[in-house]
Amino acid sequence: MGLCKCPKRKVTNLFCYEHRVNVCEFCLVDNHPNCVVQSYLTWLTDQDYDPNCSLCKTTLAEGDTIRLNCLHLLHWKCFDEWAANFPATTAPAGYRCPCCSQEVFPPINEVSPLIEKLREQLKQSNWARAALGLPTLPELNRPVPSPAPPQLKNAPVMHKEVPVHNNRSSTPATHLEMEDTASYSVSNNDVTFARKKNYGAESSSDTRPLLQLRDADNEENKYKRRPTMDWMRGLWRAKHGGSGVPQERASAKKIALFVIFLAVLALITIIMVMKRAGYSGEHSSDPLFDPMANPNIRVAVEDSRLPHV
């Protein structure tokens, strides 16, 4: 950091390599337009500098110069020709300094004397005006040299007679049938594309609403507990599509399989509940089912001492 010697007495970190003084941006624009200027810390690291243009390798004092936002100095003519070789579709961020690869166009919200002068210089070329969003000017277009036609010296002229055949065979007519027909219409303001496809009985334009009335989520239903059927319906929609699909498109086989699955699941649940309740059929250890323990039941007991008839 240093203090500029101009009447403004501004504290600055810019340093002029040629005059070896600290300069502010106002002095840089007015009094040091063709001097090599970098930060003071850069000068402390390396005091050597190149007074030539990085593009044409000639002295910077020989022509008009442009100082980029990174403080690198180049000939305006060399820089204009270098940037004009970029494609017309190059984005503003694609233009970068050939020395340090920093963006050429400064941010829109950044304001300083150096940036204001840089923007004024860039407006003198159509490639920069297009990148800045300004209309291009015809007088700023670069002249395109027309290629000179090749000159033929002492070239012999050969005349060759081509026989004319009157008995040419007629070309058979060819009929092309295309299923898809595409047509487009272009205007000055917008571009409209129309395409028609043949899908049998189905029409290409579907005017069904994306959301049905039952899909609406009211405020009063937002925090209401959902019934079980809504939960089942949500699973069905997640598996086989939303409610916007017509019923005739649903597969009857899938519906039947889903109903059978629910019936089997309910049957298994009932069997497990009854088994837990004690109706499994194993009553050998239960005294209530022992006929010998019931006093109302008389069972004849065979005596081995009685004679058999």
Swiss-Prot record:
One Gene Ontology cellular component annotation held by this UniProt entry: Golgi apparatus
Family affiliation: Belongs to the ZFPL1 family.
Chief localization: membrane
Transmembrane parts of this sequence: 254-274
SMART domains: RING
Name of this chain's protein: Zinc finger protein-like 1 homolog
InterPro entries per record: ZFPL1, Znf_RING, Znf_RING/FYVE/PHD
CDD domains named among the record's database cross-references: mRING-H2-C3DHC3_ZFPL1 (cd16487)
Keyword Membrane included in the entry's annotation: yes
